Amino acid sequence: MKEERAQQIAEQWLTHAAESAGQNDLKLHMGMISKRVSVQGVPGFDNIDYDTWYTQCRHQFENAMIKSIAYKGLNLISETETQINFTVYETVVGSDGTLNEQIVEMSLEKEDDDVWRLVQERVLIENDAMRNHELS
């Protein structure tokens, strides 16, 4: 896969993830997440799997807890025909005004139904973030 195409797929995925969360659309949002997802680096959790993510999103969406999610500075790490790895700066604004900003490393995978889904996410600690991500 060409780098430009991988960049486009990742950007489209991020746009749809932010829009579905902003619209509190649980079905659409979770349709973008692999049943095999694994999230590391979230304080208080060793690992977040699909069921935990679903439960958290359902609670947040039903209670309209997220005002917006935005991404910027996508930095492509690697790409193949079926996987795209990148880092991106994520900003989550809560409906109560709380602000959470972090750099995350994400892996998207083209699953058997030809849909690109998130299979892995890692919240980077500051040293990792500075080494692996250049904010544009």
Predicted regions: what is each one?
Residues I33, E90-V92, R122-L124:
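Short beta-strand segments enriched in hydrophobic/aromatic residues
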Residues N63-M65, V92-N100:
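Short, cysteine-centered beta-strand-loop-beta hairpins and adjacent loop/turn segments enriched
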Residues E101-S136:
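Short beta-strand edge/turn micro-motifs at domain boundaries
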Residues M1-R36, N47, L135-S136:
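Short, low-complexity N-terminal intrinsically disordered segments enriched in polar/charged residues
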Residues L26-G31, K35-N75:
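A solvent-exposed, acidic/Ser-Thr-rich amphipathic alpha-helical stretch
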Residues C57, Y71-L76, Y89-V92, I103-K110:
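Hydrophobic/aromatic beta-strand elements that line small-molecule binding cavities or substrate pockets
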Residues T80-E90:
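A short hydrophobic beta-strand element
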